[in-house]
């Protein structure tokens, strides 16, 4: 043990053999005390005065057997605490418990005592010193801040009795209340749940010191005088547990003389008033002094006139209490670590009462009252300061959670993909939600769904919402499908700010001299020119190592001020979250103020913005800022890339996106958690929800839990991009692929009539047709083979419709297993909720235990053309690829610019394995045409355009908005589906 504890004991007046060279100690003395003449060394102070006055300082009376010294008692407590902490830190090296002491007044003795004991045990300690006259609200404000700090594991209050109101005490979080003063801790103590609560260190010290002095408590009469509140309750309970008959009373009680005469042990909870004669306490009574004046910073040293032949002084109680507080701190840390480990959530799942026929999605959603989102957050282990609540049913989650749970083992990772879909969709979102409802609400396994945020374009267009459907959906579905927390609006604002910066820069460069342009870019402010931080970064990129704007040469000024953007190479478009076909090609700059600068441009749908892809692939705020800065918007006239960083807009984009980076927390119909975050399209982008949502969810579910995420469209598009793009960015590898199929889609691939949104299905789809199903299973078999290319086990989920027959269902499951699926399971979640997907959940759990042999499809170091060819031939089944001259030119440019080692994101129709939407089943012997190649350098991929791909959808003849309305009386949304 280090020298700190012996020194502290000597400061408090204990006899202690010298250890090493003598030290000059700060003496905590009473005025008028004289120096001890002993060479070894009891410093003049409290003990010296008592010995001179004939008082006994030890915890035993004259003639009693020698009790253990205080130093050995405290030493044992601290040593045991240190050993336990060391064992905890062996398994958790980053774990360092922190005790915070909120102190009102200048109590240096208590401060020193806490600091020395904490350091001896290996704890960190922080003192917050408030003015002595601090009010209740000020104290509570400090408590609430500490409550929500995940770095703090214990909180103690050392303030005057007058300030310790019930409101103040119960402001403490019970799990951080190492003094055991909250009603919850006291209630558990009284109920007999001492192992589950914190016991008052002061009360526990009092009882232990009596026992250490050789007194048997069984049958003794104990009187607690002048104590109240938590201390009184704890003392009474602890003495009663030892078999003592315990009474409690204030000093002013009329029966006090009789009670004192009857007591074997008297515990003083406050100073004895002068008017109460000392003779009321009979000789031979054991007295414990538990009072300490926090404002004066002085130990009470006993109450005036109290007989001291069996006095256990306050400094003895205080020192042991401080050591026991450290013991409680270690227990708090141990409990906290246990909470961080995998545990089954204490989740209150919402009950479903499925109806038949199944009502509309919005009726089902509205018929279920969601839990308050803060309740859900607490159930899954989020701290109060880790969420930002939006309304009652959605919240954003802070990225700091990843740091707190960095040592937590990830859960199992499940990807939901699908066969080549009909235009109606085959229910991947519904399967995803049904699966997590089954896992958590029915199998009691922690699980999280991670979904993309839907664009408002399809919501008001032809597809409708994307919250799932039937009894497997996210609620409230109208909030899910509309603005949510504004992430897409933030992307729109950031994207269009960058677009404005591009054209504005071209305009200003074309109308100003180098000097005028430079003077405006680096203006005089109070007579001084200074480069901004982002301008210094540009200088560094240009190889100009200067920081004084006045020292640049004319050539350096020109290089710095002029980007020389080639308008013909601009790839950055403006965006809007609305389907508007008339913005597919526009002319900008036709106003007279633009001085004749105009060019042809276009609008894309907002979710096609590269900023959406950046949001989906980033893993931190720092990474997002770097990715935003790397986004290439054009080339200059020398063929070099021009980035957002060159335009000086990176910081502004990051500011606009700082809240959008936080995943959005919602819930399913059965009250299980869902992250809704990022929504890139799968045909024109990579089509997956965010890396951050997946990473946070994997930590929250724990080692035995499951995170289920979805890849857009068919496995040939969304799943391939998930593996080759998202998994490269995240470093995560899924344990299982769930491949969603429907009898309807299989009939289409088997040669059935075309399926068109808004047009009733032909009879082939509503009546049994075994042959069509059998012929169409070729597409299912191909998609299973694609998943197997990556070495991940496949479970087929057959999303059953009411028109499907048992023979059709059995046939699909049989053929899927023959094709190599680990299992194939019919699912009824749409009509029955999680209960209808329990078999799927069991199959997924079993498949997740199978060893995955994951591998990427290609090496990113291959040339761009070869990577495109690998995907076309291996995944789509193409004979070869054909590059247009423009595509070849772009590939050459990106390779020359150093972007040739990025993964590939194919922009292709989702309605066929080929480039032709009407080619169903498994097309063969086709050549895949690459019409253009673009680059999302910030997101980190090259995306070839296959055939003609529109990045701005249009509205149909009868859009969904015909059915959408608002009840102005109730403010309820109608018509969403």
Curated annotation (Swiss-Prot):
Location, primary (coarse class): mitochondrion
Molecular functions (GO terms): ATP binding; formate-tetrahydrofolate ligase activity; methylenetetrahydrofolate dehydrogenase (NADP+) activity; protein homodimerization activity
Group of enzyme by EC: ligase
Known partners and oligomeric status: Homodimer.
Assigned EC number: 6.3.4.3
Localization (cell): Mitochondrion
List of residues that carry N6-succinyllysine: 188, 595
Keywords: Acetylation, ATP-binding, Ligase, Mitochondrion, Nucleotide-binding, One-carbon metabolism, Phosphoprotein, Transit peptide
Metabolic or biological pathway: One-carbon metabolism; tetrahydrofolate interconversion
Binding site for ATP: 422-429
One Pfam family linked to the record: THF_DHG_CYH
Annotated stretches, region: Formyltetrahydrofolate synthetase: 348-977
Region entry Methylenetetrahydrofolate dehydrogenase and cyclohydrolase, spans: 32-347
InterPro entries noted in UniProt: Aminoacid_DH-like_N_sf (IPR046346), Formate_THF_ligase (IPR000559), Formate_THF_ligase_CS (IPR020628), NAD(P)-bd_dom_sf (IPR036291), P-loop_NTPase (IPR027417), THF_DH/CycHdrlase (IPR000672), THF_DH/CycHdrlase_cat_dom (IPR020630), THF_DH/CycHdrlase_NAD-bd_dom (IPR020631)
High-level lineage: Eukaryota, Metazoa, Chordata, Craniata, Vertebrata
Source species of the chain: Mus musculus
Entry protein name: Monofunctional C1-tetrahydrofolate synthase, mitochondrial
Modified sites of kind N6-acetyllysine: 188
Region (Disordered): 29-71
GO terms under biological process: 10-formyltetrahydrofolate biosynthetic process; embryonic neurocranium morphogenesis; embryonic viscerocranium morphogenesis; formate biosynthetic process; neural tube closure; tetrahydrofolate interconversion
């Amino acid at each position: 043990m280090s020298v700190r504890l012996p020194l502290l004991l000597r400061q408090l007046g204990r006899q202690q053999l010298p250890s090493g060279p003598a030290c000059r100690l700060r003496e905590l003395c009473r005025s008028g005390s004289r120096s001890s003449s002993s060479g070894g060394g009891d410093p003049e102070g409290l003990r010296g005065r008592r010995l001179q006055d004939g008082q006994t300082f030890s915890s035993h009376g004259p003639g009693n057997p020698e009790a253990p010294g205080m130093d050995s008692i405290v030493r044992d407590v601290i040593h045991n605490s240190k050993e336990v902490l060391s064992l905890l830190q062996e398994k958790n090296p980053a774990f360092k418990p922190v005790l915070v002491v909120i102190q009102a007044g200048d109590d240096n003795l208590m401060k020193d005592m806490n600091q020395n004991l904490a350091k001896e045990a290996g704890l960190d300690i922080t003192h917050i010193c408030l003015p002595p006259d601090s009010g209740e609200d000020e104290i509570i404000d400090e408590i609430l801040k500490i409550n929500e700090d995940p770095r703090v594991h214990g909180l103690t209050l050392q303030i005057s009795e007058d300030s310790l109101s019930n409101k103040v005490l119960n402001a403490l979080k019970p799990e951080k209340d190492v003094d055991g003063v909250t009603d919850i801790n006291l209630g558990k103590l009284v109920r007999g749940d001492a192992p589950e609560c914190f016991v008052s260190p002061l009360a526990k010290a009092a009882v232990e010191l009596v026992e250490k002095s050789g007194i048997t408590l069984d049958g003794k009469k104990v009187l607690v005088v002048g104590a109240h509140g938590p201390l009184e309750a704890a003392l009474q309970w602890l003495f009663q547990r030892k078999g003592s008959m315990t009474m409690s009373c204030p000093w002013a009680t009329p029966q006090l003389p009789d009670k004192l005469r009857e007591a074997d042990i008297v515990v003083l909870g406050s100073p004895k008033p002068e008017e109460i004669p000392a003779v009321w306490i009979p000789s031979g009574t054991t007295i414990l002094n538990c009072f300490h004046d926090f404002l004066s910073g002085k130990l009470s040293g006993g109450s005036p006139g109290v007989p001291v032949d069996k006095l256990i002084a306050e400094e003895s109680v205080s020192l042991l209490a401080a050591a026991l507080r450290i013991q409680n701190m270690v227990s708090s840390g141990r409990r906290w670590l246990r909470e961080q480990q995998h545990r089954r959530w204490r989740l209150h799942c919402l009950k479903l009462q499925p109806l038949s026929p199944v009502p509309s999605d919005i009726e089902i959603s509205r018929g279920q009252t969601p839990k308050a989102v803060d309740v859900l957050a607490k159930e899954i282990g989020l701290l109060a300061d880790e969420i930002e609540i939006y309304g009652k049913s959605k919240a954003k989650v802070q990225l700091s959670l990843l740091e707190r749970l960095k040592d937590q083992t990830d859960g199992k990772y499940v990807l939901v993909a699908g066969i080549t879909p009909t235009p109606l969709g085959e229910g991947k979102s519904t399967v995803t939600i049904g699966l997590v409802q089954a896992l958590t609400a029915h199998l009691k396994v922690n699980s999280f769904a991670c979904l993309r945020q839907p664009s408002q374009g399809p919501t008001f267009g032809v597809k409708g919402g994307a919250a799932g459907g039937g009894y497997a959906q996210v609620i409230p579905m109208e909030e899910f499908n509309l603005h949510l927390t504004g992430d897409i609006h933030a992307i729109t604002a950031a994207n269009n700010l960058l677009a404005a910066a591009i054209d504005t820069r071209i305009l200003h460069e074309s109308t100003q001299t180098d000097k005028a342009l430079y003077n405006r870019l680096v203006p005089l402010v109070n007579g001084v020119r200074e480069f901004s931080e982002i301008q210094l970064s540009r200088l560094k990129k240009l190889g100009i190592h200067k920081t004084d704007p006045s020292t640049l040469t004319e050539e350096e000024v020109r290089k710095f001020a002029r980007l020389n953007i080639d308008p013909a190479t601009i790839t950055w478009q403006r965006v809007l979250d609305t389907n508007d076909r008339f913005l597919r090609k526009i002319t900008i700059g036709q106003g007279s103020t633009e001085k004749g600068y105009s060019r042809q441009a276009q609008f894309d749908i907002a979710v096609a913005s590269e900023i959406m892809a950046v949001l989906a692939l980033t893993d931190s705020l720092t990474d997002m800022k770097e990715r935003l800065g790397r986004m290439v918007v054009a080339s200059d006239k020398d063929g070099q890339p021009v980035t957002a960083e060159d335009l000086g807009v990176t910081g502004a984009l990051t500011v606009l996106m700082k809240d959008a980076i936080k995943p959005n927390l919602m819930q399913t119909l059965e009250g299980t958690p869902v992250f809704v975050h990022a929504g890139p399209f799968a045909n024109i982008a990579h089509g997956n929800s965010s890396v951050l949502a997946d990473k946070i969810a994997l930590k929250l579910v724990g080692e035995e839990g499951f995170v289920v995420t979805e890849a857009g469209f068919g496995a040939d598009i969304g799943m391939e991009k998930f593996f080759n793009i998202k998994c490269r960015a995240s470093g995560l590898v899924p344990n299982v692929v769930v491949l969603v199929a429907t009898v309807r889609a299989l009939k289409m691939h088997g040669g059935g009539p075309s399926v068109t949104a808004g047009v009733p299905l032909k009879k082939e789809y509503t009546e049994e047709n075994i042959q069509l199903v059998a012929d169409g299973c070729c597409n299912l078999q191909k998609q299973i083979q694609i998943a197997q290319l990556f070495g991940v086990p496949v479970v087929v989920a057959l999303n059953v419709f009411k028109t499907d027959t048992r023979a059709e269902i059995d046939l699909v499951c049989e053929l899927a297993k023959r094709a190599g699926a680990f299992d194939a399971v019919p699912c009824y979640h749409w009509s029955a909720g999680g209960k209808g997907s329990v078999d799927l959940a069991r199959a997924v759990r079993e498949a997740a235990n199978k060893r995955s042999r994951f591998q990427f499809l290609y090496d990113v170091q291959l040339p761009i053309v070869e990577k495109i060819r690998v995907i076309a031939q291996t995944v789509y089944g193409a004979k070869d690829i054909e590059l247009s001259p423009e595509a070849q030119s772009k590939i050459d440019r990106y390779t020359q610019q150093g972007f040739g080692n990025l993964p590939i994101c194919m922009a292709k129709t989702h309605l066929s394995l080929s480039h032709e939407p009407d080619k169903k089943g498994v097309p063969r012997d086709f050549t895949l045409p690459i019409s253009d190649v673009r680059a999302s350098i910030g997101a980190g991929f090259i995306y070839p355009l296959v055939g003609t791909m529109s990045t701005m959808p249009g509205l149909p003849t009868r859009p969904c908005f015909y059915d959408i309305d608002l009840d102005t009386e109730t403010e309820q949304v109608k018509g969403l589906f």
